[in-house]
């Protein structure tokens, strides 16, 4: 197993320091080659925060009693006193990077970059940029050059910003796909309004739950599918008068 890590002031202890908004206390990487597995279990968690980035292979986490598989690009965040249990397997050549951090405004900082209090795992993106940023933080902790603590905060914030942009991009794509799907549904209902249309059947035929279809149709079109069909029928009847 390849490992490279560094610690603030060479301390292996959990650091809790609220004197500054955000403080990086340690950073490192693991890459499994021949070792069969690498398991971490902290029943009472740690006193600080931790963010784990899966760069290659897979990582297996237990989060809120559920087993979760993290693929490349996934980020997992642990908060103070949160139970930690995760495992990496050598035959999957897993590569992960991790960073521990503390500070007086950590919650606000995470929220600012789209990581709300109930979020434990999210997709940050499978980008080489993250490897570079993690390695820069490791190097800063190892070399301790002038103003390195400020540089650590700067690099970590850059990482959080990149992850936030990825989430915003993913949300935008999801909304765009949903809007196109609802436009197609509206076009179909508009063309076949005079036929016997069962909303539930349409949703099932297009692999959508009925509640999801109705909710997103209303959000995109401004009315429910049934109301939309009725409005078309009423408009047609008025034209025939």
Question: Where are each of the predicted segments found?
Answer:
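Amphipathic alpha-helical segments enriched in hydrophobic/aromatic residues interleaved with Lys/Arg
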Residues: 108-174, 187
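Short, structured helix-loop boundary elements
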Residues: 21, 48, 127, 131, ...
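Ligand-binding loop in jelly-roll beta-barrel domains
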Residues: 67, 81-105
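Short acidic-glycine-tyrosine-enriched beta hairpin
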Residues: 65-79
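Generic protein-terminus/edge-of-domain signal
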Residues: 1-69, 90, 107, 113-120
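Short helix-to-turn junction characteristic of helix-turn-helix DNA-binding domains
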Residues: 54, 189-192, 241
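Basic/polar phosphate-binding segments, predominantly the helix-turn-helix DNA-binding elements
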Residues: 162, 184, 190-235
């Amino acid at each position: 197993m390849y490992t490279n890590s560094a610690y603030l002031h060479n301390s292996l202890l959990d650091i809790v320091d609220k004197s500054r908004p955000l403080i990086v206390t340690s950073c490192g990487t693991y890459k499994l080659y021949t070792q069969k597995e690498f398991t971490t279990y902290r029943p009472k968690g740690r006193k600080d925060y931790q963010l784990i980035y899966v760069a290659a292979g897979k990582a297996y986490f237990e989060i809120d009693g559920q087993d979760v598989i993290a693929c490349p690009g996934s980020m997992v965040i642990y908060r103070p006193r949160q139970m930690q249990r995760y495992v990496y397997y050598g035959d999957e050549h897993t590569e992960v990077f991790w960073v521990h951090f503390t500070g007086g405004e950590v919650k606000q900082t995470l929220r600012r970059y789209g990581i709300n209090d109930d979020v434990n795992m999210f997709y940050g993106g499978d980008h080489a940029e993250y490897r570079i940023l993690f390695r820069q933080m490791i190097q800063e902790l190892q070399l301790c050059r002038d103003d390195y603590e400020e540089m650590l905060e700067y690099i970590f914030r850059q990482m959080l910003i990149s992850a936030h942009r990825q989430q915003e991009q993913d949300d935008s794509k999801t909304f765009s796909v949903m809007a196109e799907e609802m436009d197609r549904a509206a076009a179909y209902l508009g063309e076949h309004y005079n036929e016997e249309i069962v909303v539930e059947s349409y949703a099932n035929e297009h692999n959508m739950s009925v509640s999801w279809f109705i909710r997103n149709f209303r959000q995109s079109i401004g009315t429910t599918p049934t109301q939309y069909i009725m409005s078309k029928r009423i408009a047609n009847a008025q034209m025939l008068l």
